[in-house]
Each structure stands twice: as C-alpha cells, then as structure tokens.
C-alpha cells in the first residue's frame, strides 16, 4: 500500500529533508513525498536530484493556490509564516490529488528507522492522528505553546479528517505567532 507524506523545508533544512526522504526509501516499501520548497535554492537542488517518489511544490505555487495563506505572509515573521504553511500543505495535496486517501504531514527533521506500517495499522480506522507532547513535569510550562506535537499529523480524506484539517488551517491563518 502506498503511503502519502508531505513536508517542507528551505536550504537550511535541505540535508535534514534529504535524510527524511532516504529514511523513507529504506523503511517504507511504497510512498510519495510532496515537498514544499520554501526557497529557490532548495527547489533547484531537489529538481536536479530527480528523486523517485518526491514531488516538488515551489512556495509560489502554494501561495497562488491559497490566497489566505499569501495574505498572512504580511503579518508574521518568516518562521511564523513557515509554521502557518503546516496545515496548508496537506490541504493543497488533498485538493490536487484525489487518489490520496490519507495525507501525513512530517517535520523535515524526522527519520524513520523501520517501516511505519505498525503506526498506520494502529490508526487505520481513524480520521485524524496527532501526537501529544507528553511533557515531563519539569517542562509543563511549555504547554503554553500547545499540547500537541505537529511533527507527525495524519488526516484521512473523510468528513472528520477534512473538517479537522480545515479548522487547523483556519486557526493557523488567524494566529500562528
């Protein structure tokens, strides 16, 4: 079964993004990875590499397809803007690729040491998969930044999954700084 992932990075995270890709190549039998290239250097390097299963999305393409995202660019820092892209990217993939039944957003600095099939088996009937931070009591003050880690977030193309993704996108567009 083909797994569908998306991530984003710029030239500063290019090596991490490539490590994520290579770990997927070794651990996941069949996958597609959409990469939102946050700068032209990243896009050009990945375009030259022509990696199988990797699909490139220049930032400009996402912005042209999401006017609300583009409008948000003017009221936040570059890093905050990148974070705002987190729900917009899986939305874009689902809107443009109707065969994708579940999209999983991954932070670019993740690395797979084994096949993620067990994880997908566990969430097989779930519309949404999200991981709580599970802060150690010493770090509970960090809950002010959120109780969930968005490093791995998965959405099924069904009513609940799409509604949750849409709500997350709206909330990030309203406030992500």
Where are these regions (language model features)?
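Glycosyltransferase catalytic domains, chiefly GT-A lineage
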Residues: 1-177
């Amino acid at each position: 079964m083909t797994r569908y992932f998306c991530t984003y990075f710029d030239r500063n995270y290019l090596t991490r993004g490539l490590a994520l890709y290579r770990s997927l190549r070794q651990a996941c039998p069949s996958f597609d990875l959409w990469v939102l290239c946050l700068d032209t250097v990243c896009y050009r390097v990945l375009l030259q590499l022509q990696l199988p299963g990797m699909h490139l999305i220049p930032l400009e393409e996402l912005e042209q397809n999401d006017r609300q995202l583009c409008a948000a660019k003017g009221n936040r820092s570059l890093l905050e803007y990148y974070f705002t892209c987190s729900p917009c990217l899986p939305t874009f993939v689902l809107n443009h690729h109707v065969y994708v039944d579940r999209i999983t957003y991954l932070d670019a600095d993740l690395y797979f040491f084994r096949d993620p099939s067990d994880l997908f088996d566990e969430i097989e009937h779930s519309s949404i998969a999200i991981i709580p931070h599970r802060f150690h009591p010493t770090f509970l003050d960090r809950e002010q930044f959120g109780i969930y880690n968005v490093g791995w977030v998965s959405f099924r193309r069904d009513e609940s999954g799409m509604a949750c993704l849409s709500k997350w996108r709206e909330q990030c567009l309203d406030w992500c700084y």
